[in-house]
Curated annotation (Swiss-Prot):
It is found in: Endoplasmic reticulum lumen. Residues 357-423 form the J domain. Keywords: Chaperone, Endoplasmic reticulum, Repeat, Signal, TPR repeat. This is DnaJ protein P58IPK homolog A. TPR repeats lie at residues 36-69, 70-103, 116-150, 152-184, 185-218, 231-264, 269-302, 304-336.
Length: 476
């Protein structure tokens, strides 16, 4: 090692950048060109290059040879302050003031040191209180101003940025740290987490793995790595089961995946969508709506989630909601014929929901036979004949009109088939009031012919009083 003292400076300098041990410099200083003044000068050059570790080693070497070198104490204090080794820096400033009392500039530097030290302590306190914005204020505005090479502050800053979900900046900040020290485990962990929360799982995994190669028992790296591995495995199981048609198992897998990390929104958006699709296929519309809504809360531009929620609303017979979602999806993706087809179905169902339910008016099921339809019509026509309801004639006329219109459609097999298919019929009153609906008591309009074998008995109302059996009457 003594031979090292004979090495030229161009060879020695790179080694100085890597070592700060006083022992190293004891050997180095034996060279004829490595006297304290030369080492001190080179230390200042290193400081100007922001090579603080190298300059610290040189200053240590100076003070080994010349313990009362006041400027070496001052400059070493400055380097230590830069690296936020505040207690050591304070000792060096105090030593300088012993050697040269009354230096206002050094007293100012000491004051800045104490200010940075207090700010770093406050930043840690704010981090524990989860006030991450204040953490950044203390670090950026004070600590890193006076201690620009403070690794603790840089790591705390990265943690605060991670908590604030500023993942891109975390990647940038930890990148600077790893450029100086590629094996920094804290930086590898933080950078891996940032990539993880950006859903770049492959890159995240590589960071975790590198850290674990350096320290296989690092608890946080192990937790992050195996947590990611389990998440990917469970997600794949959900997707595989969905592809195989094992929909109930797939739904449970998706739910289990979502429970692993509720804060992983950039990834969970796809899990919510996958779950929604499976629930739609299972016919569980209400649950599907909830899952797709969660996806849209994360990414409101996710067309697939809008489409699937529209399909889910069709299952719950929320026709208007389905049309709204599918129309928005169609606007965002106008070339998608699948969305257009779904929108047409939703619009048809909405239209059908607003038309008259002739079966309900006659009080019969949709599977009623022609004979049952006729019997129901006869019964209701007698019940609501206006001449039999003089005290509530207006209500009776309205009901009789509805009954007549219902029978006009359901009593005709062709019209009934078309009605059941959801087709529009000009002859039908599709509901909503107004227009050319059937009105047997008004002038003009449509003409309906009713055949009734039993006859209306009793007088009043219509011309001729009661009607004999086998009669025919027209409303024009």
């Amino acid at each position: 090692m003594v031979a090292m003292a004979r090495w030229p400076w161009r060879v020695l300098l790179p080694l100085l950048l890597l070592h700060s041990s006083p022992v190293f410099f004891v050997f180095a200083q034996e060279g004829q060109d490595n006297d304290p003044s030369t080492l001190f000068k080179r230390a200042l050059e290193m400081m100007n290059l922001r090579k603080y570790d190298g300059s610290l080693g040189l200053l240590n070497a100076v003070l080994e040879v010349e313990p009362n070198h006041s400027e070496a104490y001052r400059q070493r204090a400055s380097v230590l302050r830069h690296k936020c080794r505040y207690k050591e820096a304070e000792g060096d400033y105090s030593k300088y003031l012993e050697l040269k009392p009354g230096s206002s500039s050094v007293e100012k530097e000491l004051s800045q040191l104490l200010q940075a030290q207090n700010a770093l302590e406050s930043a840690y306190g704010q981090f524990e209180s989860h006030d991450f914005s204040k953490v950044l204020d203390y670090i950026n505005k004070i600590v890193l101003v006076f201690s620009p090479d403070c690794l603790k502050a840089k790591l705390l800053k990265a943690k605060a940025l991670l908590a604030l979900k500023d993942y891109s900046t975390v990647i940038s900040e930890t990148g600077f740290i790893l450029k100086e020290d590629e094996d920094n485990l804290d930086a590898l962990l933080l950078r891996g987490r940032a990539y993880y929360y950006l859903a770049d799982h492959d890159v995240a995994s590589r960071h975790y793995q590198k850290g674990l190669r350096l320290d296989p028992e690092h608890s946080e790296l192990k937790k992050a790595y195996f947590g990611l591995k389990n998440l990917v495995k469970k997600t794949k199981s959900a997707e595989d089961n969905a592809a195989k048609g094992k929909l109930r198992v797939s739904a449970e897998d998706y739910k289990a995946s979502l429970a692993m990390d509720p804060d992983h929104t950039s990834y969970n958006v796809h899990l919510y969508l996958g779950l929604c699709k499976v629930l739609v296929k299972l016919g569980r519309g209400k649950e599907a709506i909830s899952s797709c809504t969660e996806a849209l809360n994360i990414d409101g531009e996710l067309v697939d989630a809008l489409t699937q929620r529209g399909e889910a609303k069709l299952l719950t017979e929320d026709w208007e909601g389905a049309v709204q979602d599918l129309k928005e999806a169609a606007q965002k993706s106008p070339q998608d014929m699948g969305i257009r087809e779904a929108l047409m179905r939703a619009e048809k169902q909405l239209k059908l929901s607003k038309r008259k339910d002739w079966y309900k008016i006659l009080g019969i099921s949709k599977t009623a036979s022609a004979a049952e339809i006729k019997r129901a019509y006869k019964k209701l026509a007698l019940q609501w004949h206006p001449d039999k309801n003089v005290d509530k004639r207006e209500e009776a006329e309205n009901m009789f009109r509805e009954i007549a219109a219902a029978y006009e459609v359901l009593g005709d097999e062709d019209k009934r088939v078309r009605y059941d298919r959801g087709e529009d019929l000009d002859e039908m009153n599709m509901g909503g009031g107004g227009g050319g609906g059937f009105n047997p008591f008004g002038g003009g309009g449509q003409q309906y012919t009713f055949h009734y074998d039993g006859g209306f008995h009793g007088g009043g109302g219509f011309p001729g009083g009661g009607f004999p059996g086998g009669f025919q009457f027209n409303f024009g």
